């Protein structure tokens, strides 16, 4: 190519990337060629084969070509099917009713409206939660034990610990007493027990 020779036609990628640079010496034909048209940006799948570029027929989509293999159309495609075949006009668009009265549509609605039976689990059996009556029976037994008279403190503490472990579920209190049998661990345990008994945590 000669130095002064400029390309007369450019492809789209050259126009997008701007690989050609021009000076001020060329005319409107080159600048028109550099401008992007609507067809460069928007490339529809199928355009009607009308050669006239009037606004009514340009860029009209062919709905039949965009159908799937099974040929089904639903939703907005079905609603606007009649309006896309005819050229657009200045009159307002009338949306077609998708489901007509009677026929298969009502049967589908009946099927959707009914619900299957639901199995509701019995959580008291799953989590082994005692009923309200059994909790009251346990409280009555505890009251009978306390009414029996005076008992030594170590027996009272053992019974109260057993009662607490039954209410909680056998795990006992979830407070770490301390590592080993240190004085600090024992003292904190006594403080903890005193605070819990005064605040009513033990019951």
UniProtKB/Swiss-Prot annotation:
GO annotation, cellular component aspect: cytoplasm
Keyword Hydrolase: no
Keyword annotations from UniProtKB, A to Z: Cytoplasm
InterPro entries referenced in this protein's UniProt entry, alphabetically: Senescence_reg_S40 (IPR007608)
Leader peptide range in chain numbering: none
Coiled-coil ranges (or none): none
PANTHER family documented for this protein: EMB|CAB72159.1, SENESCENCE REGULATOR S40
Stated name of the protein: Protein S40-6
């Amino acid at each position: 190519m000669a130095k002064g020779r400029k390309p007369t036609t450019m492809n789209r990628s050259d126009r997008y990337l701007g690989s050609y640079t021009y000076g001020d010496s060329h005319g409107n034909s080159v600048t028109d060629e550099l401008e992007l048209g609507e067809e460069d940006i928007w490339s529809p799948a199928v355009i009607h084969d009308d050669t006239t570029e009037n606004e009514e027929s340009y860029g009209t989509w062919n709905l039949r070509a965009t159908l799937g293999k099974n040929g089904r159309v639903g939703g907005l495609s079905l609603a606007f099917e009649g309006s896309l075949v005819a050229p657009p006009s200045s009159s307002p668009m009338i949306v077609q009713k998708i489901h007509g009265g009677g026929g298969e549509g009502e049967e589908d609605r009946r099927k959707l409206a009914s619900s299957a039976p639901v199995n509701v689990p019995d959580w008291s059996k799953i989590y082994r939660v005692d009923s309200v009556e059994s909790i009251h029976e346990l409280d009555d037994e505890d009251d009978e034990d306390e009414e029996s008279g005076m008992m030594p403190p170590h027996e009272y503490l053992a019974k109260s610990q057993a009662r607490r472990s039954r209410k909680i579920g056998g795990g006992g209190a979830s407070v770490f007493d301390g590592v080993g049998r240190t004085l600090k661990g024992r003292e904190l345990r006594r403080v903890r027990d005193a605070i819990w008994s005064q605040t009513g945590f033990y019951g």
